Amino acid sequence: MSSILKQRVRYAPYLQKLRTAEQCVELFKHGQYLGWSGFTGVGAPKVVPDAIADHVEKNNLQGKLGFNLFVGASAGPEEGRWAENDMLLRRSPHQVGKPIAKAINTGKTKFFDKHLSMFPQDLTYGFYTREKENDLLDYTIIEATAITEDGSIVPGPAVGASPEMISVSDKIIIEVNTVTPSFEGLHDIDMPVNPPFRQPYPHTTVDYRTGLTAIPVDPSKVVAIVESQTRDKVPPNTPSDETSRNIANNLLEFFEHEAKLGRLPENLHPLQSGIGNIANAVVEGLADSKFKNLTVWTEVLQDSFLDFFESGSLDFATATSIRLTEAGFDKFYENWDTYSKKLCLRSQVVSNSPEIIRRLGTIAMNTPVEVDIYAHANSTNVMGSRMLNGLGGSADFLRNSKLSVMHTPSARPSKTDKTGVSCIVPFATHVDQTEHDLDIVVTDQGLADLRGLSPKERAREIITKTSHPDYRDQLTDYLDRATFYAEKSKCLHEPHILQDAFKMHLNFQENGTMKLDSWDKKF
């Protein structure tokens, strides 16, 4: 037992349950239902999952030792290793990484995505364990950075669905990460209370705290304490580029316009932002803008938010995860006293709560796969079928925020077309967010304000303002043709030609380009 482990584990009876990761392997059997802590690649267990993968590889148990795995969102590289070893029978609700995406799209792993605000509560309802006799997860493996005097768990850089998983787990294994500094005091934990006893959330500001800083645990459920000395491994963030900066500039001009007209306050409303180079560009733009005293209510914070804090423009941020690179975490730890006063990590049912999002009037900003001319957005399935990562929390925010923004390049790079694949299409091949959820669509070409517009008005606005010039005439032609035929059949509300609606996608699959010679082309 290391001295730092003894210092971190302040509940003495747990020290009698010390095990190595290898000693825990015997506890796991094929077909079990497992919960892991973690969210967006940080705060997940590491040494126990790796020990199980070692066991599978050494004994050629690929496909013979598999599990139903539930994580708040994505975990770290450990779940990718599980996917490579055919150890994931079922996975939910969100994932990131080529190995697991391959397992899902080749049919080896059954995957279902779910709104991240709903997933933890549905887990406590027994919806995902209803095939089991006791409705419980067999094991939850949770990473802690400290354990309090009463046995409660202090998470690390992610809370996610850990409170709910612990509440519905038969047995619990705690990995105490001693290479990561203790995050004690940074969290605000809400334990699940199911209907009809659930009460309204009291949060009225982004810095409101209920007061619980660790996750309560029934000590009798804890079967092992394992020391971990493995840091989170987050790949470098995609830097902003000219396209993403143009998107950010278009959006910031809109914010300035709305503030000038009094539809937004001078410090805006609490901001929600996703991950990626567009999100980075927006954060960078806000840090350099005239907007001050800003606040954030979001799912995940990345490295750019540290610079946002340092700019003096950001007062406080709430999230369920801090997804930082190694350099980002080093910077965070070095300035702990500064950042910890301006930051709160919450359960994902709180960070993504539609009730709180609507009350605070957040501004939601997310990136889709594609948006169609009537403002339906596809966030998950390329060409309607190939799963990327999952829905995540985008719809939690987009349906409930005061302003719901979809930002996307007008076209994405393609190996077979110099313009790329159009992100504005006649008809989305899969719909995650409907036309009723989006207020703004913004690309590097411009911004379409859709508030209060009819479908045909939205279509003209989206095509004219946001589509790539190389696709604009083609999309306009589709809308004109659809309107012509719809007028004949008296169905002009939202005109479509079903036999043409996916021709851009079909042409890309057959010919490597979304550019059509003619809409009369047959497939």
From Swiss-Prot:
Binding, CoA: 274-278, 389, 393
Superkingdom of the organism of origin: Eukaryota
GO cellular component terms listed in the entry, alphabetical order: cytosol; mitochondrion
EC number(s) from the headed UniProt entry: 3.1.2.1
Any one GO molecular-function label of the UniProt entry: acetyl-CoA hydrolase activity
Keywords noted in UniProt: Cytoplasm, Hydrolase
Key word Calcium present: no
Gene Ontology biological process terms from the UniProt entry: acetate metabolic process
Enzyme active site: 299
Location in the cell: Cytoplasm
Keyword Cytoplasm among UniProt keywords: yes
Coarse class of the protein's main subcellular location: cytoplasm
Catalytic reaction(s) noted: acetyl-CoA + H2O = acetate + CoA + H(+)
Family the UniProt entry places it in: Belongs to the acetyl-CoA hydrolase/transferase family.
Described function: Presumably involved in regulating the intracellular acetyl-CoA pool for fatty acid and cholesterol synthesis and fatty acid oxidation.
Name of the protein: Acetyl-CoA hydrolase
